[in-house]
Amino acid sequence: MARHNHHFHCLRIAFALGFVLTAGSIQAQTPDMRIRKKLIATGWDHPDTQRLLENLAEMEKRPFDGVVLEATGVTAEGKSCSLRPAFSNQRWQREWFQASVDQLRACKFTRFTDNFISLGANPGNVDWFDDEGWEEIVEHWRIAAWVAKQSGCKGLLFDPEPYAKPHAQFSYAAQPGREQHSFSEYADKARQRGRQVMKVIVEEYPTITLFCYFMNSISATATGRADPRLALAAQGYGLYPAMIDGWLDVVPPTVVLVDGCESAYRYNSRQQFLESALRIKGVCQELVSPENRAKYRAQVQASFGMYLDAYWNPKESPWYIDGLGGPRVERLRVNTTAALAAADEYVWVYGEKYRWWPTPRKNVRPESWNEAMPGCEQALCYARAPLDFARTELANARQAGNLVSLVRNGDFSLMEARSIDGAEQKWRDGGPPAGWSAWQGKDSKGSFTWDQEAGVTGKGAAKASRVAEGCFLQSFHVAAGERYAVRASCSVHGRGSAWLRVRWQTSAGQWTAEPQDRVFYGEASADNWRELLGVVEVPEQAGRLSILLGVAGQAAPEDVVWFDDVELYRLGEPLEKSSP
C-alpha cells in the first residue's frame, strides 16, 4: 500500500472536510451555497415580448435559463419603436413600452429565471460632445432599465457592436468632432456619459444585471503599457473602456456587470476559456482607473459566447470549429462545459442560421437547430446540468430494460465477485464484501465488513464501524473522454460522515489527475438512506476509475456507516455527427 500514501494523505483533507459538510446541525442551518451556472439563449431567432408570451411553454423545453428578448413600443402615431437602437437622438416616452411590460408580466415562467432586454449602440450617430443628443440617449437607458425592472427581467443585454455604418459609437476615427477634440478629450467625455447612463439605470433598477456581449475583453490588446490610450485611439472600440470606467464611477455594489467575451466564438479548448477568464479578471483592469479597480474586481463577471453556427459551418468558413478527430457537436458539449466552468455565472448561446423556436425572421432557416445539428440540444443539456442529464438518461435506460451497472457486487449480495482483471475473489469472514478492498489510516482502528442482513432492501451492505478515516475501494478500466454516472446509497448511525469519491489512476495503477477528483455527498432523507450521485469525465492521462466509499469521524463501535447499491454507468455513446 506504499504507493497509496500520497493519495490517502490527500484523502485525509477530504475526510475532515466531509465531516464538516455533512454534520446535521450545519445542514439544518446553511442555505444552498451553490453557484448556479446558466445558459442564456440569443441570436437571430430571439423573441419579442409578444412571441415570448405566445410560445413560452414550448420555449422553456429548450436547455436554457433565460433569453435575450426585444421590447418594442408603439408611439402615439401608432409606429413601432424598438428599444435596441438606443444611441439615437430620437425622443422616447416610457408609456410607449407599457404593453411590453404587461406581456412580460403575463408570462408564467417555470424555467426562464434570467431574461434580458436587448439594447444596442446603434445607430451611433450622436457625437459624445452633443449634450442634447446625449440627453435623449440617457433617457433611452432609463426607459430600458424601467422596462426590465417593471417586467421582472434580470436586466439588460447591451450589444456595443456598430451595425449602421459609417457610424461607430466607440471608434474615435468615426467621431464627427475628431478634428476639434483629441482622443483623450473624447475618452473623458465618454466617461462622463457612462456616469450619466449608470446613474439613471440604478435609479430605476438598483439591483440590475447589465450583461454585455463584451466589455474590456475586446480591448485586451491595449493592456501592458503605461498609457493604454495610445493603443485605444486606433481601435474600433477605443472609447468603450472610458464609458465602462464611467459606469464604475457611480455603480452601487448591488449591480452586476457581465463581460460576455464575444471573442470566445472560436475557442476550442479548456485552456482558452481559462486564459480568457484570467484576462478579464486580471490585465483588463489596466483599462480601468485605479480608484475603480476594486469595484471592477468585485462586480464584473466573466462570461463567454458560444457561436452555434461555427459547429455547423463548412471548413472553408472563417467561423469554423474543428471536431479534433470526433463529432463537431461533441466539441460543442466539451467547449460549453469548459465555458461554464470558467465563467462566473453565465454563458450565452448565439445562433444565426437556424432556430430554437418560432420566428418571423426571413433570414433564419425553417429547420430547428436540433434538425440541422443532431445532438446539439443533448450537448447543451449535459453541459448545463450533468446530474439532471444523467438522471434522465438512466431513467430512460431503466425503462427500456437495458440499464446494467459496471460495479462488481454493487448490491453487496454475493459471496464472490471478480476483480478488475477478472480473477474470482471470495468473501473472507470479517473482511470487506467480495470484489471490494478497504483502506484506513494508521491511527484508525475500525472495521470494514459485509453485513449480510442490512441494506436498502435487506439483502446486504458494506459496513464500516469505528473508522477514524478510511474507505472501501473498487476500480474499473476506462478510456479518456468517457463520461460516467456514479451513485450509491449510505446510512450513517451515530457519529461520523460518509461520501463517495471518484479518483483516477493510469493504466498501470498509478494515481493521477488529482485536481480532477470528484467527491459527492448525499442529502438527508426520511428513511435514513441518502443518495450519493455524481457525473464524471475521464481525464486524458487516466486509464482507471476508482470508486472510494469514504468514512471518517467514527470513535465508538456504535458509530456505523452502511453503503449499498453502488452503481456505475457509462453515459451515452459519442453524440451524433453534425452537418458538414
What are these model-predicted stretches?
Residues M1-C10:
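N-terminal secretory signal peptides that target proteins for export/translocation
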Residues S25-Q27:
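Sec/Tat signal peptide C-region and signal peptidase I cleavage site
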Residues A397-P580:
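Extracellular and organelle-lumenal recognition/adhesion modules and their flexible linkers in secreted
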